[in-house]
């Protein structure tokens, strides 16, 4: 086991604070509308330019191990805020730095660290309740666009794109961000349910100009098995031919004689058919077939529940207004399933999302909800260079997370104003002893830090602006972009309540632990092996190689 270096008391805390300050100072230059960029060197390729707090934090690793411990703990604050709300990482870092700095001053002055932590926790719990009370629901398109704009660093086009995407696919719809091909940002909306499986034979194509299969008002046969014998399907094919409608077959696979017969029937115009493989694998495939059945009002023909393909009737088939199939995807538009059944299925999947343990499962379940509930929107980010594309894409993703958080828990006045108002409302809060009261004051002082940093990044005097804002009430604050005072909500400067709440809670959590640190232990650096170059009669020649 390697030898350890141990530091106690003030020595340990001073080192830790130095690490905290290095990381926080690098992150906080990005805060606010006039925040600056940070350039991150990469071991290969061009450097990355970012204004995203958590991206900056993740890059920082310090040489001194004690300082690095402090930096890594604040990195945890940024990461946790990012995981919970997808934004607010810089705010969380600024709050943590302020609580740690003020808290360690109090410890150095002889306060009890445990009581300080209890005071901080008490103030934060009260502040969270007040934030919830201040929160205003965010439901209309204008508010969503404003939240997106602020989070994308005052880029109005991004805010509008996100609001438009949410309008089109609903609050539950899936919105993804991809690299675009041009200079302009684009929004691509896929309505209905789309899955990544194309036609099984190009002979099904009936729109040669687009290379797609389009079926109007088709019946949809869903089978959880491989179909290779055409005899199994004859009763269904005959019934569909009599009805004079096209048929879409979604099965585990359609092969051999069955596929050949379907192709011949289609080419002769006896019955218009297209076949695709079912999406997913294993249990996920069964679940997705059931989703399609719910959406189209059909039944999955599965031997597990004793159903046989030969005995299937038109009642077992689903229906949709239109189906479009190309070589990679199938889109079912306007299934005829009952709204109540679809909502029931969505609720069931939501329950599974709550219980999911892995991010991958959660993401896949979320996609299934979106496909049932509305559709999928893709924001294609346009930029002139790859470096700009990466930076912009990160901003758009942040803005998307922020708008989701706003829809979930509502919004409060932005620009650090909400925390100032909350601090004034709980200013009379008292702890059980004087040390706890100091802890409460430390937390209240920290709640001013985001506003002060935003103002500092504008080149103005933080104390003057902070006092003016404190003198106002309600949503009165300072618009750093235009350097004007006024109603923040009217000016469209909003922060999602969830982002502000998460930033405060995670900052206080980690800062409280750091204030109560009394000892730090790390590995001693390994000393280099002695230089053996002088051995073997080469006196005085050591290190010549």
UniProtKB/Swiss-Prot annotation:
Name of the top EC class for this enzyme: isomerase
GO molecular-function terms, A-Z: ATP binding; ATP-dependent protein folding chaperone; isomerase activity; unfolded protein binding
InterPro entries for this protein: Chaperonin_Cpn60_CS, Cpn60/GroEL, Cpn60/GroEL/TCP-1, GroEL-like_apical_dom_sf, GROEL-like_equatorial_sf, TCP-1-like_intermed_sf
Record bears the keyword Nucleus: no
PANTHER family linked: 60 KDA HEAT SHOCK PROTEIN, MITOCHONDRIAL
Subunit structure: Forms a cylinder of 14 subunits composed of two heptameric rings stacked back-to-back. Interacts with the co-chaperonin GroES.
Protein name: Chaperonin GroEL
Source organism of the structure: Salmonella agona (strain SL483)
